[in-house]
A protein has these predicted regions:
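Nucleotide and nucleotide-moiety/phosphate-recognizing core
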Residues: 1-134, 139-159, 166-180
Length: 181
């Protein structure tokens, strides 16, 4: 998309603001994972700086697992800032499904959604996966035997819609206006 995706505007607020608002409405333990310290976007949340660079979103998961240990949490939910329509019942449904599993991952329209997954904060399993060269969130989810949770969708209303380009941002803006009426 070019530029800083978290700072792109949707419905009068940044994508990051939408994600932070969604998360803080569901938990009192929310942190913001960033690649480097200079990416300070929201000083009201704890900032987690990626320890592993150049490996993508799984680095944020490692930071989240560290945060979970520090705050004595068994699970973490990692979301991307580019999914502004996450379902309100995401945490409840994934929490009900995870059981003793390593993760509960939603699926929608036949696609797994690793950036909206509830993870058991198993730092050892993640360290082992990374040491063997693993870098895929989906791959790690399969490694820890993630339970999948199917999400029903309505036409044109994928709750895991992902904004990856300017056209998707325009589509999200149209959808945002429709849903906020």
């Amino acid at each position: 998309m070019g530029g800083s995706k978290p700072l792109r505007m949707l419905g009068g607020a940044t994508l990051l603001r939408h994600a932070c608002d969604w998360a803080t409405a569901r938990s009192d333990h929310v942190a913001l994972a960033v690649r480097e310290a200079g990416q300070l976007f929201d000083e009201s949340l704890p900032l987690l700086i990626d320890r592993h660079t150049g490996i993508g979103p799984i680095s944020a998961l490692a930071s989240a697992f560290d945060f979970a240990q520090a705050t004595k949490r068994e699970h973490v939910l990692v979301i991307g800032c580019d999914q502004p329509f996450l379902p309100n019942n995401l945490v409840a449904r994934l929490s009900a499904a995870i059981g003793d599993g390593g993760a509960a991952m939603p699926t929608s329209l036949g696609r797994e959604q690793p950036l909206a997954t509830l993870w058991r904060a198993d730092r050892g399993a993640l360290a082992e996966y990374l040491a063997k060269g693993g870098q895929s969130l989906k791959g790690f989810a399969h490694r820890v035997n993630a339970v999948t949770v199917e999400w029903e969708t309505e036409p044109g209303c994928d709750p895991f819609f992902n904004i990856n380009d300017p056209m998707a941002l325009e589509e999200a803006e149209r959808r945002f206006r429709r849903t906020r009426r």
